[in-house]
Regions:
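Short, charged, low-complexity patches
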Residues: 70, 138, 142, 329-337
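Short amphipathic alpha-helical signal-transduction/dimerization elements
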Residues: 15-19, 146, 150, 259, ...
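Surface-exposed charge patches
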Residues: 13, 75, 147, 222, ...
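A small/polar active-site loop signature that marks catalytic segments
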Residues: 115, 125-266
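Residue-level marker for well-ordered alpha-helical positions
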Residues: 9-12, 71, 143, 218, ...
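Small-residue-rich helix-loop
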Residues: 200, 204-347
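Residue-level marker for the onset of beta-strands and adjacent loop->beta junctions
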Residues: 24, 143, 305-306
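Active-site-adjacent loops and short helices of periplasmic peptidoglycan-processing enzymes
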Residues: 1-136, 152-185, 189-195, 205
Length: 347
């Protein structure tokens, strides 16, 4: 079992498909007309594009250092002359399927992830202090855009709701995520399950126009196979499912294959640095491995994993993958650390 080493498959495929500089857009479309007085006669549709970082400006700055926000959309709508809206704000999450989770939670909301949505707002949290989850993410996001418009001095007559955007709705404004390179860094450094489950659906969205966990997992597996690292099975994007399986050899082949790709610098930068940041910060704080090894950790009940790269004292770069099943994760980590110290210490 891979545990969160599954994220190596998800993020490498996302980088390859989108490119390191790509950004995910959340846009506002409209079905009306704007007159010279600033009245928009019609309704506005907030269309999610699968951005895991979208939300309020304050939340995005605190959590990610910035990202797409409802405040940006409100200011841009005002900038194009909108002063009032006769209709209402609709939230549209239809670029993803309606399933809120992965197979580990029977496709319902997982307490380890939160509600997955094509129009995710503040990670699906019901409040900015992190308490509770949204029952209806697209309606929640629409209400937050409505509130942001009100603060900007734009009056909206109708109450916000969730609905699919009608054909022919015109694009008005958009806001964008950080780059894909940053999104996968946020995913891998801290082992972010929410970002990983959003990104696996983004894979399917980019390929087929509809974001699904199953479709994205198939694409991630196919990409790894092209690099010689095809897994036994991938069931989700984060590694919460015990159906994510591969041998250490296959993980190592994926990692080695990434070294020859243009996206490798971004992929390498996304991994935790031993003793310094991410999930490896509390580990390997001394010895040859500190600062010389980068990796992705993984933990489930009875499962512990770490895979990545070590630059040894000799200057040679070693690819490693250690997947341990049927173990006590705490004790397993100690053994893994000794192995990485040995690799990094090669002269």
């Amino acid at each position: 079992m891979l545990a969160s080493n599954t994220k190596l498959f998800t993020t490498s495929a996302a980088l390859a498909r989108y490119g390191a500089a790509a950004r995910l857009a959340t846009e506002v479309r409209g079905t009306g007309t704007l007159d010279t007085e600033g009245t928009y006669s019609g309704s506005l549709y907030l269309v999610g594009g699968g951005d895991p970082s979208f939300g309020s400006g304050g939340f995005a700055r605190r959590a990610y250092g910035g990202g797409g926000s409802v405040e940006t959309l409100a200011s841009r709508l005002k900038a194009i002359g909108v002063r009032s809206v006769t209709g209402r704000i609709y939230g549209d999450e239809s670029k993803f399927d309606s399933l809120r989770g992965g197979p580990d939670s029977r496709y319902r909301i997982s307490p380890y992830v939160g509600p997955v949505s094509g129009l995710a707002y503040n990670r699906g949290l019901a409040s900015e202090n992190g308490r509770g989850y949204q029952a209806n993410p697209p309606a929640f996001a629409a209400a937050r855009l409505d509130a942001a418009l009100s603060r900007a001095g734009v009056a909206v007559r109708g109450a916000p709701r969730a609905a699919r955007t009608p054909a022919g709705a015109a694009p008005l404004v958009k806001t964008e995520s950080p780059t894909m390179a940053k999104l996968i860094r946020l995913t891998n450094k801290s082992s972010d399950n929410f970002f990983a489950e959003m990104l696996v659906k983004d894979l399917a969205l980019q390929a087929s126009g509809k974001g699904t966990t199953r479709g994205g997992a198939k694409l991630a597996a196919a990409f790894a196979k092209r690099l010689g690292g095809g897994p036994g099975s991938l069931a989700d994007g984060s590694g919460l499912s015990r159906g994510n399986r591969a041998s250490p050899y296959r993980v190592a082949r994926l990692l080695q294959g990434m070294r020859g790709r243009d996206e490798f610098p971004a992929f390498f930068d996304s991994l935790s640095i031993a003793g310094r940041d991410g999930t490896l910060r509390p580990r390997l704080r001394g010895g040859a491995a500190r600062g010389r090894c980068r990796g992705k950790t993984g933990t489930l009940s009875g499962v512990s994993a770490v895979s990545g790269y070590c630059t040894a004292l000799s200057g040679d770069v070693y690819v490693f993958s250690i997947l341990m099943n049927g173990v006590n994760p705490s004790g397993a980590r100690g053994l893994q650390d000794r192995m990485l110290q040995a690799i990094a210490g090669v002269r």
